[in-house]
From Swiss-Prot:
This is Bifunctional protein FolD. The lineage of its organism: Bacteria, Pseudomonadati, Pseudomonadota, Gammaproteobacteria, Alteromonadales. Pfam families: THF_DHG_CYH, THF_DHG_CYH_C. One of its GO terms (cellular component) is cytosol. NCBIfam families: PRK10792.1. It comes from Shewanella baltica (strain OS155 / ATCC BAA-1091). The gene is folD.
Amino acid sequence: MTAQIIDGKAIAQSIRTKLSEKVTARKEAGQRIPGLAVVLVGADPASQVYVGSKRKACEEVGFISRSYDLETSCSEDELLSLIDSLNDDPTIDGILVQLPLPAHIEDSKVIERIRPDKDVDGFHPYNVGRLAQRIPVLRSCTPMGIMTLIKSTGVDTYGLDAVVVGASNIVGRPMTLELLLAGCTTTTCHRFTKNLEQKIRIADLVVVAVGKPGFIPGEWIKPGAIVIDVGINRLDNGTLVGDVQYDVAAQNASFITPVPGGVGPMTIASLLENTLYAAEQYHD
Protein backbone atom coordinates (compact mmCIF):
# COMPACT_ATOMS: atom_id res chain seq x y z
CA MET A 1 0.00 0.00 0.00
CA THR A 2 1.22 3.48 -0.85
CA ALA A 3 -0.52 6.33 0.92
CA GLN A 4 -2.48 9.02 -0.86
CA ILE A 5 -0.97 12.44 -0.22
CA ILE A 6 -3.23 14.94 1.55
CA ASP A 7 -2.30 18.11 -0.33
CA GLY A 8 -2.62 20.88 2.26
CA LYS A 9 -1.29 23.44 -0.17
CA ALA A 10 -4.06 22.80 -2.71
CA ILE A 11 -6.81 22.61 -0.08
CA ALA A 12 -5.61 25.85 1.53
CA GLN A 13 -5.58 27.56 -1.88
CA SER A 14 -9.17 26.45 -2.44
CA ILE A 15 -10.17 27.96 0.92
CA ARG A 16 -8.40 31.23 0.12
CA THR A 17 -10.17 31.44 -3.25
CA LYS A 18 -13.57 31.00 -1.57
CA LEU A 19 -12.71 33.60 1.06
CA SER A 20 -11.63 36.05 -1.63
CA GLU A 21 -14.99 35.59 -3.37
CA LYS A 22 -16.81 36.26 -0.09
CA VAL A 23 -14.79 39.42 0.51
CA THR A 24 -15.64 40.63 -3.00
CA ALA A 25 -19.33 39.93 -2.32
CA ARG A 26 -19.12 41.90 0.93
CA LYS A 27 -17.59 44.87 -0.90
CA GLU A 28 -20.29 44.77 -3.56
CA ALA A 29 -22.97 44.66 -0.85
CA GLY A 30 -21.44 47.74 0.79
CA GLN A 31 -20.21 45.80 3.82
CA ARG A 32 -16.96 46.36 5.67
CA ILE A 33 -13.81 44.46 4.66
CA PRO A 34 -12.57 42.12 7.45
CA GLY A 35 -9.45 43.36 9.26
CA LEU A 36 -6.63 41.41 10.92
CA ALA A 37 -3.99 42.92 13.20
CA VAL A 38 -0.73 40.95 13.39
CA VAL A 39 1.60 41.73 16.29
CA LEU A 40 5.24 40.58 16.31
CA VAL A 41 7.50 41.16 19.31
CA GLY A 42 11.22 40.88 18.57
CA ALA A 43 13.06 39.64 15.50
CA ASP A 44 12.97 35.85 15.77
CA PRO A 45 13.66 34.65 12.18
CA ALA A 46 11.11 31.80 12.26
CA SER A 47 8.43 34.11 13.67
CA GLN A 48 9.20 36.71 11.00
CA VAL A 49 8.67 34.07 8.29
CA TYR A 50 5.35 32.93 9.81
CA VAL A 51 4.12 36.49 10.23
CA GLY A 52 5.13 37.36 6.66
CA SER A 53 3.12 34.38 5.35
CA LYS A 54 0.06 35.44 7.34
CA ARG A 55 0.24 39.03 6.11
CA LYS A 56 0.66 37.89 2.50
CA ALA A 57 -2.33 35.54 2.78
CA CYS A 58 -4.44 38.39 4.17
CA GLU A 59 -3.64 40.56 1.20
CA GLU A 60 -4.38 37.71 -1.22
CA VAL A 61 -7.97 37.30 0.03
CA GLY A 62 -8.54 41.05 0.27
CA PHE A 63 -8.54 41.51 4.05
CA ILE A 64 -7.20 44.64 5.68
CA SER A 65 -3.88 43.66 7.27
CA ARG A 66 -2.33 45.85 9.94
CA SER A 67 1.19 45.11 11.18
CA TYR A 68 2.66 45.98 14.57
CA ASP A 69 6.36 45.11 14.96
CA LEU A 70 7.60 45.76 18.49
CA GLU A 71 11.14 45.63 19.86
CA THR A 72 12.22 42.62 21.93
CA SER A 73 12.67 45.05 24.84
CA CYS A 74 8.99 46.06 24.65
CA SER A 75 7.41 45.81 28.12
CA GLU A 76 4.46 43.58 28.92
CA ASP A 77 2.38 46.67 29.74
CA GLU A 78 3.16 48.20 26.33
CA LEU A 79 1.97 45.05 24.58
CA LEU A 80 -1.18 44.81 26.71
CA SER A 81 -1.92 48.48 26.00
CA LEU A 82 -1.66 47.83 22.24
CA ILE A 83 -4.05 44.88 22.57
CA ASP A 84 -6.51 47.08 24.48
CA SER A 85 -6.51 49.63 21.65
CA LEU A 86 -7.00 46.90 19.02
CA ASN A 87 -9.83 45.41 21.08
CA ASP A 88 -11.58 48.78 20.80
CA ASP A 89 -10.82 49.30 17.09
CA PRO A 90 -14.01 48.66 15.05
CA THR A 91 -12.02 48.05 11.84
CA ILE A 92 -10.20 45.07 13.38
CA ASP A 93 -11.98 41.69 13.53
CA GLY A 94 -9.02 39.56 14.56
CA ILE A 95 -5.92 40.06 16.69
CA LEU A 96 -2.96 37.73 16.31
CA VAL A 97 0.05 37.97 18.62
CA GLN A 98 2.82 35.76 17.25
CA LEU A 99 4.12 33.25 19.81
CA PRO A 100 6.51 32.57 21.43
CA LEU A 101 6.95 35.89 23.20
CA PRO A 102 10.17 37.07 24.91
CA ALA A 103 10.72 35.53 28.35
CA HIS A 104 9.75 38.69 30.26
CA ILE A 105 6.23 38.66 28.79
CA GLU A 106 3.70 36.10 30.04
CA ASP A 107 1.99 34.33 27.13
CA SER A 108 -1.18 33.51 29.06
CA LYS A 109 -1.70 37.10 30.19
CA VAL A 110 -1.44 38.31 26.60
CA ILE A 111 -3.76 35.61 25.24
CA GLU A 112 -6.38 36.38 27.88
CA ARG A 113 -6.19 40.13 27.18
CA ILE A 114 -7.44 39.64 23.60
CA ARG A 115 -11.22 39.89 23.44
CA PRO A 116 -12.65 36.39 22.82
CA ASP A 117 -14.57 37.64 19.77
CA LYS A 118 -11.28 38.83 18.22
CA ASP A 119 -9.23 35.78 19.26
CA VAL A 120 -8.76 34.38 15.75
CA ASP A 121 -5.93 32.10 16.93
CA GLY A 122 -8.50 30.31 19.10
CA PHE A 123 -6.23 30.30 22.18
CA HIS A 124 -8.38 32.24 24.67
CA PRO A 125 -9.71 30.06 27.53
CA TYR A 126 -13.25 31.08 26.52
CA ASN A 127 -12.84 29.70 23.00
CA VAL A 128 -11.05 26.53 24.14
CA GLY A 129 -13.83 26.08 26.70
CA ARG A 130 -16.48 26.41 24.00
CA LEU A 131 -14.74 23.63 22.07
CA ALA A 132 -14.61 21.47 25.20
CA GLN A 133 -18.34 22.04 25.69
CA ARG A 134 -19.00 20.93 22.08
CA ILE A 135 -20.15 24.39 20.98
CA PRO A 136 -17.06 25.72 19.14
CA VAL A 137 -16.89 29.19 17.67
CA LEU A 138 -13.35 30.48 17.04
CA ARG A 139 -11.28 27.28 16.98
CA SER A 140 -7.52 26.82 17.34
CA CYS A 141 -6.13 27.21 13.83
CA THR A 142 -3.85 24.19 13.44
CA PRO A 143 -6.33 21.61 14.82
CA MET A 144 -9.12 23.25 12.81
CA GLY A 145 -7.01 22.99 9.65
CA ILE A 146 -6.19 19.36 10.43
CA MET A 147 -9.89 18.54 10.71
CA THR A 148 -10.40 20.06 7.25
CA LEU A 149 -7.59 17.83 5.92
CA ILE A 150 -9.10 14.73 7.53
CA LYS A 151 -12.54 15.54 6.09
CA SER A 152 -10.96 15.85 2.63
CA THR A 153 -10.10 12.13 2.74
CA GLY A 154 -13.78 11.18 2.91
CA VAL A 155 -13.07 8.82 5.82
CA ASP A 156 -15.80 8.65 8.49
CA THR A 157 -14.10 9.57 11.77
CA TYR A 158 -16.82 8.19 14.06
CA GLY A 159 -15.46 5.24 16.01
CA LEU A 160 -11.85 5.62 14.85
CA ASP A 161 -9.08 5.00 17.38
CA ALA A 162 -7.06 8.24 17.28
CA VAL A 163 -3.72 9.01 18.91
CA VAL A 164 -2.41 12.55 19.37
CA VAL A 165 1.32 12.72 20.14
CA GLY A 166 2.07 16.01 21.88
CA ALA A 167 0.00 17.86 24.47
CA SER A 168 0.74 21.54 23.82
CA ASN A 169 -1.91 24.22 24.30
CA ILE A 170 -1.51 25.23 20.65
CA VAL A 171 -1.92 21.83 18.97
CA GLY A 172 -2.14 18.70 21.13
CA ARG A 173 -4.83 19.62 23.64
CA PRO A 174 -7.29 21.34 21.29
CA MET A 175 -6.61 18.59 18.72
CA THR A 176 -7.79 16.02 21.25
CA LEU A 177 -11.00 18.02 21.76
CA GLU A 178 -11.56 18.29 17.99
CA LEU A 179 -11.18 14.53 17.54
CA LEU A 180 -13.55 13.81 20.43
CA LEU A 181 -16.07 16.10 18.77
CA ALA A 182 -15.56 14.15 15.53
CA GLY A 183 -16.50 10.89 17.27
CA CYS A 184 -13.01 9.41 17.70
CA THR A 185 -11.85 7.39 20.69
CA THR A 186 -8.88 9.60 21.46
CA THR A 187 -5.63 9.00 23.34
CA THR A 188 -3.27 11.91 24.04
CA CYS A 189 0.41 11.01 24.46
CA HIS A 190 3.12 13.19 26.00
CA ARG A 191 6.57 13.01 27.56
CA PHE A 192 5.37 10.77 30.41
CA THR A 193 3.49 8.31 28.19
CA LYS A 194 4.54 4.67 28.51
CA ASN A 195 4.35 2.18 25.63
CA LEU A 196 4.01 4.84 22.93
CA GLU A 197 4.77 2.30 20.20
CA GLN A 198 1.95 0.03 21.38
CA LYS A 199 -0.53 2.92 21.22
CA ILE A 200 0.59 4.07 17.75
CA ARG A 201 0.45 0.56 16.29
CA ILE A 202 -3.30 0.21 16.96
CA ALA A 203 -4.28 3.75 15.91
CA ASP A 204 -6.51 4.36 12.88
CA LEU A 205 -5.55 8.04 12.94
CA VAL A 206 -2.26 9.50 14.19
CA VAL A 207 -1.55 13.21 14.70
CA VAL A 208 2.05 13.99 15.68
CA ALA A 209 3.14 17.41 16.96
CA VAL A 210 6.36 17.20 18.98
CA GLY A 211 8.95 19.10 16.92
CA LYS A 212 11.47 16.24 16.72
CA PRO A 213 12.57 15.00 13.28
CA GLY A 214 11.58 11.40 12.57
CA PHE A 215 10.34 10.91 16.13
CA ILE A 216 7.77 8.28 15.09
CA PRO A 217 9.28 5.35 13.13
CA GLY A 218 7.32 4.64 9.96
CA GLU A 219 7.01 0.94 10.77
CA TRP A 220 4.86 1.79 13.80
CA ILE A 221 2.06 3.01 11.55
CA LYS A 222 -0.85 0.60 11.29
CA PRO A 223 -1.66 -0.48 7.71
CA GLY A 224 -4.41 1.80 6.39
CA ALA A 225 -4.04 4.48 9.08
CA ILE A 226 -4.32 8.22 8.43
CA VAL A 227 -1.12 10.09 9.39
CA ILE A 228 -1.12 13.83 10.09
CA ASP A 229 2.41 15.20 10.62
CA VAL A 230 2.39 18.65 12.23
CA GLY A 231 6.16 18.83 12.75
CA ILE A 232 8.39 20.97 10.57
CA ASN A 233 12.07 20.51 11.37
CA ARG A 234 15.09 21.80 9.47
CA LEU A 235 18.01 19.36 9.31
CA ASP A 236 21.66 20.47 9.19
CA ASN A 237 21.65 20.05 5.40
CA GLY A 238 18.69 22.44 5.12
CA THR A 239 16.08 19.77 4.36
CA LEU A 240 12.66 20.18 5.99
CA VAL A 241 11.26 17.01 7.57
CA GLY A 242 8.36 16.13 9.83
CA ASP A 243 8.04 14.28 13.12
CA VAL A 244 7.21 10.99 11.35
CA GLN A 245 9.65 8.92 9.25
CA TYR A 246 7.82 9.71 6.05
CA ASP A 247 9.09 7.18 3.49
CA VAL A 248 8.26 4.09 5.55
CA ALA A 249 5.05 5.56 7.01
CA ALA A 250 3.81 6.31 3.49
CA GLN A 251 4.09 2.60 2.66
CA ASN A 252 1.74 1.70 5.52
CA ALA A 253 -0.73 4.59 5.72
CA SER A 254 -3.82 5.10 3.57
CA PHE A 255 -3.46 8.90 3.72
CA ILE A 256 -0.52 11.03 4.87
CA THR A 257 0.37 14.74 4.98
CA PRO A 258 3.70 15.77 3.45
CA VAL A 259 6.21 18.12 5.10
CA PRO A 260 6.26 20.82 3.89
CA GLY A 261 2.92 21.38 2.14
CA GLY A 262 0.62 19.54 4.51
CA VAL A 263 -0.53 21.08 7.78
CA GLY A 264 1.35 24.41 7.56
CA PRO A 265 -0.71 26.05 4.80
CA MET A 266 -3.92 24.95 6.54
CA THR A 267 -3.03 26.79 9.75
CA ILE A 268 -2.98 30.08 7.85
CA ALA A 269 -6.13 29.21 5.88
CA SER A 270 -7.95 28.51 9.17
CA LEU A 271 -6.76 31.84 10.58
CA LEU A 272 -8.34 33.60 7.60
CA GLU A 273 -11.56 31.59 8.01
CA ASN A 274 -11.70 32.60 11.67
CA THR A 275 -11.20 36.27 10.79
CA LEU A 276 -14.13 36.25 8.36
CA TYR A 277 -16.22 34.30 10.88
CA ALA A 278 -15.49 36.93 13.55
CA ALA A 279 -16.49 39.72 11.15
CA GLU A 280 -19.75 38.01 10.16
CA GLN A 281 -20.83 36.61 13.52
CA TYR A 282 -19.65 39.27 15.95
CA HIS A 283 -18.90 42.57 14.25
CA ASP A 284 -21.28 43.12 11.29
